[in-house]
Amino acid sequence: MKKLIAILLLLTLMLCAVSCKKDDTTPSGMKDAATADAEYHLYVPEMWVPNNGNGISGAYANSTDKANVTVTSYLPDTVMSAESYFNDVCLPQYENGTLSGFQVLNDLCGDTMLGGLNAKKYVYIYSLAGVDYETMQVIASTGKMVYNLTYTATAASYADYTEDVEEIVKAFAFR
């Protein structure tokens, strides 16, 4: 009788453990830094610090360096591809704005994926307030909505986080 009770208790515990398992798709070693109402998951390494100000999903690598990743969504007035978003919306602002020495690094640009969507990757350098920066934008479009994942770091520390950022881009997923 004691064996039967022990077996039933064990089966009950196992059933509870299996039924209570949450369906968490967070990749190992990462956490979700997306805002609660975002249409996507922005998975970043555990050691990165989420920074979700003004409804923009983001995280930075550490409090010293401030290398960061952000994701913004853009609803254009007309259907827009990733390439047209960069060329028609972003590029004019960068070239005519406050970024001095702006230069696209064409050999680092190309096709990629973001959350299962075809995307374009753009890498460029510039100076702002006397500091040299390097930025990578990964842009995907559903036609109606444009998603823009941006990684920015000082030129001196950019390479320190590119492996993390490649994992962030790879893990990005729509809800």
For every predicted segment, state its role:
Residues 54-141, 146-147:
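Conserved polar/disulfide-associated segments of primarily extracytoplasmic proteins
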Residues 5-11, 15-66, 108-114, 128-132, ...:
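N-terminal targeting sequences that direct proteins away from the cytosol to non-cytosolic compartments
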